[in-house]
Regions:
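Sec-dependent N-terminal signal peptides of Gram-positive bacterial secreted proteins and lipoproteins
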Residues: 4-26
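Carbohydrate-active catalytic/glycan-binding domains of CAZyme proteins
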Residues: 27-408, 413-461
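Exposed boundary/loop context
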Residues: 15, 339, 348, 463-465, ...
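Cellulosome-associated attachment modules in secreted, modular CAZymes
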Residues: 19-26, 461-533
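Hydrophobic alpha-helical segments, especially transmembrane helices
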Residues: 7-8, 52, 484, 520
Length: 533
């Protein structure tokens, strides 16, 4: 794969503010993912994470067109740092394309619906939200021959939107290229077969991009408009029924900046908040690419907060470049996958022999940014899982920018192969509090090394045996806590080191012997515990 141009724009475009009566500002992030060009995102909350499933734009200057043959999945638990799960589904067999996916969860499985260009919709299934997904039928689930579709001339059978209602009934929405070209059909409980015939939904100036969601008992059908009123927007309708009776309500997402074309969106919740995801073409522009075809056919996904008015209508989103709040800080003292990042320059990712993915294609000057890392009182060392078929290089640990404060440098030597892994360590000084962390890679020419994961370490803390509440003293409160633990009333102690501090005889478990030792200490029968000697 050709190396992506590395220089990123320092400043992303701050975009237009759209004012509508009764609306408030909603904030977006773009781009949120840099390793590949992606579009048509659909969101799913699963296992405490938000997953986005995206079309993957591959540009061929000899064939300027939308080339999308696989699906990229990314996920986050903080809305700033995104894990790259790679291409989780690849078109094959009957399907030559994989366009605009949607994923829903049911039966302890995950079902992906995708367009084979505009000729039909397939379904793939996985046991995990991060894939891999496998084609479930080896043929289209719906196409122009499906009962009730009755495709008029120019009908596009693509852009699926799937939805499982509260009563367990599932629906599939699809279609494109005309106001009367939306179709909805029921799915059976197996999610890979249809039930009955398709019905028509008519959306004013509908073009493509069907999406359905439910809010306060109402059904919201949203879609991309055509060019008849200017630049396409995301408009929506509301109904009391998932298949009929929709009433047009207006625009929820204006034409994004740096787009200049139609759009594709999804609306979903994560941790109680509503979001809308879509795409524009900011990433390719920020890299200084001027080829109009490359700009047209290489998109990037974005995400935005979404709000409702008291009457149930949706407020129009106002798009900004960096508006979302990071939901939690990154813990640097646990193993962090290298493919989880907020931004990068120059690198790629690939499947890793140790599982998951690794960062590869690392050359001199490349970097990875991790947003909002909480170093607390300070890190003293850094570990990195690396592999190199060459002479390696260095990982510079910098704060807040790629040229920011240097807090450590980890030297990486050759390991004999790009998947021959070893752990390298280095000392760290000056990393305290919350910062953006930059892993900056330096060395000679060509590819330097691959990176699987990283982790910081703190200085060892002194254990005060018997101090279970973290007060710095051993007293009756600690005795009471130990009693509660042994009775099963509590499963941990207020002190972060409480479980270790309660093992007073250092036999590897907390039991009645520790209780006796604590009692003797408080009665003055002993002055120290065996574990402290």
């Amino acid at each position: 794969m050709l190396k992506i141009v590395k220089k990123l724009s320092i400043l992303l475009v701050v975009c237009m503010v759209v004012s509508v009566l009764g609306s408030i500002t909603a904030f977006a992030d773009y781009p949120i993912f840099y390793q590949r060009y992606t579009a048509d995102p659909s969101g799913l909350e699963a296992n405490g994470r938000l997953y986005l499933y995206c079309s993957h734009d591959v540009y061929d200057p000899n064939n300027p067109n939308y080339i999308m043959n696989d699906i990229t999945c990314i996920s986050t638990d903080d809305m700033k740092n995104w894990t790259d799960h790679g291409e989780v589904f690849k078109a094959s067999g009957w399907a030559n394309y994989a366009w605009a996916p949607v994923v829903v969860a049911r039966n302890n499985k995950y079902y992906m619906y995708f367009g084979n260009n505009a000729t039909g919709i397939g379904v793939a299934v996985s046991d995990s939200p991060s894939g891999p997904f496998k084609d479930a039928l080896g043929k289209a689930l719906v196409n122009g021959s499906t009962p009730g579709v009755n495709p008029p001339s120019g009908f596009w059978c693509f852009d699926p939107g799937a939805f499982v209602d509260d009563d367990g009934q599932a629906y599939l929405y699809f279609g494109g290229n005309g106001e009367g070209n939306t179709r909805v059909i029921k799915l059976n409980g197996d999610m890979i077969s249809i039930n009955g015939t398709a019905s028509k939904i008519v959306g004013p100036i509908f073009f493509e991009d069907s999406w359905i969601h439910k809010y306060n008992g109402k059904y919201y059908y949203s879609y991309s408009t055509n060019w008849s009123k200017g630049a396409p927007t995301i408009d929506y309708m509301i109904s009391d029924s998932p298949m009929t009776g929709f009433n047009y309500k207006g625009t929820v997402l204006p034409q994004p900046p740096s787009n200049g074309n139609n759009n594709h969106h999804s609306i979903f919740t994560y941790k109680g908040n509503w979001y809308i995801s879509y795409h524009n073409r900011e990433l390719v522009r920020s890299r200084g690419i001027t080829d109009n075809n490359a700009i047209t056919y290489q998109r990037n996904v974005c995400i935005d907060r979404l709000y409702y008015n008291t009457d149930g209508t949706m407020q129009m989103a106002t798009i900004t470049a960096d508006g979302l709040t990071q939901l939690k800080n990154v813990n640097p003292y646990i193993t962090n996958e290298a493919e989880t990042m907020a931004q990068e320059s120059g690198i790629n990712t690939e499947e890793c022999s140790e599982g998951s993915r690794d960062v590869n294609n690392i050359e001199n000057g490349d970097w990875v940014k991790i947003r909002g890392v909480d170093f607390g009182t300070g890190a003293v060392s850094f570990d990195a899982r690396v592999a190199s078929a060459t002479n390696g290089g260095n990982i510079e640990l910098r704060l807040d920018s790629a040229t920011g404060k240097l807090v450590g440098t980890c030297a990486v030597q050759g390991t004999g192969g790009w998947q021959t892994w070893t752990t390298k360590s280095c000392n760290v000084s000056g990393a305290t509090g919350v910062h953006d962390l930059y892993l900056k890679f330096t060395g000679g020419g060509g590819n330097l090394f691959n990176l699987n994961w990283w982790k910081f370490k703190t200085a060892p803390t002194e254990i005060i045996y018997g101090d279970l509440d973290g007060s710095g003293d051993v007293n009756a409160i600690d005795f009471s806590l130990l009693k509660k633990y042994l009775l099963g009333s509590i499963s941990n102690f207020p002190s972060p080191n409480g479980l270790k501090a309660a093992d007073l005889d250092s036999n590897g478990k907390i039991d009645v012997l520790d209780f006796v030792l604590m009692k003797k200490y408080l009665l003055g029968m002993i002055t120290e515990f065996p574990a402290g000697k």
